[in-house]
Design a protein with these regions (language model features):
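Helix-loop junctions that connect tandem helical modules in alpha-solenoid scaffolds
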Residues: 8-15, 40-49, 93-102, 132-141, ...
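HEAT/armadillo-like alpha-solenoid scaffolds in large eukaryotic assembly and transport factors
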Residues: 26, 70-87, 158-171, 181-185, ...
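Eukaryotic helix-linker segments that join adjacent hydrophobic helices
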Residues: 49-113
């Protein structure tokens, strides 16, 4: 199965339109095999497959999750849904890619994991949140960036006032990354502020039903953040390529 998927992925990358079209149709057929997801996850992990094929594999896996991971998906298509044993294998492989030294693979894996989280957390993948927080806390700057990419999609779309325990755990890590300019990239720090803004929006949306809770907890959180945010505004603007801090300043404005 894995060899078949590999060859079809190569065809999907062909510059020849007819070859590419045939390969894309063949890939759709292979998705009907319950072993497809672990096979394509293995290819994404295989360094010998080459960067282009590995990138294609993890992108295709994300699409597969939308179509075949859960009958509750808005994009669900008829076909076998992997059992929990297969899903567990695929989750582990995708999570491993968050520690890849290839930035594109890490980012694509983060998007894939965020898609899985929509259906699997907390019931089927209860440890995911703590695993991601651990990457933020103990991982290197690239791993922290990958974990932040997951939170960037996940918090905004799938967390709510029912997840205050998780938000309370996440907020200190977001602030630590935001203020650690020497340890993390501008991009990662910008995402930390963006996710902080998403968390604050979730808390604010609770005011209609838990006004006392919001009134008690929101001010101390904002007080902790306001000083470093104002300090960011006081720094000279940098506009040099990826080191530009303009996106960071924009997110700070949105957050307050």
């Amino acid at each position: 199965m894995e060899h078949q998927v590999f060859e079809v992925l190569q065809g999907c990358l062909s510059e020849e339109p007819n070859t590419r079209m045939r390969a894309e149709l063949a890939l759709k057929q292979l998705e009907q095999n319950v072993e497809f997801s672990p096979a394509i996850a293995n290819i994404a992990l295989a360094s010998e497959a080459g960067p282009a094929v590995r990138q294609a594999a993890i992108v295709q896996l994300r699409g597969y999750i939308g179509r075949h991971w859960s009958i509750g998906s808005a994009k669900y298509e008829q076909g076998p849904i992997p059992d929990q044993q297969l899903k567990c294998q695929v989750r582990e492989k995708a999570f491993t890619l968050l520690t890849s030294d290839n930035r594109k693979l890490r980012t694509a894996a983060a998007a894939t994991i965020a898609s899985m989280a929509r259906y699997d957390w907390p019931d089927e993948w209860p440890q995911l949140f703590s695993q991601l927080v651990e990457l933020l806390h103990s991982g290197d700057r690239d791993q922290a960036h990958a974990a932040m990419c997951v939170f960037g999609e996940w918090v905004n779309s799938d967390l709510s006032g029912q997840h205050m325990e998780q938000i309370g755990t996440l907020l200190p890590q977001l602030k630590r990354i935001f203020v650690s300019s020497g340890d993390y990239s501008i991009e990662t720090r910008t995402m930390a502020v963006r996710v902080f803004g998403d968390c604050i929006e979730i808390i604010a949306n609770m005011s209609s039903v838990q006004n006392d809770f919001v009134a008690t907890h929101a001010p101390p959180i904002l007080e902790e953040w306001i000083s470093p945010i104002l300090a960011t505004f006081g720094q000279p603007v940098s506009t040099e390529g990826s080191a530009s801090d303009i996106p960071l300043k924009i997110e700070c404005i949105k957050a307050i």
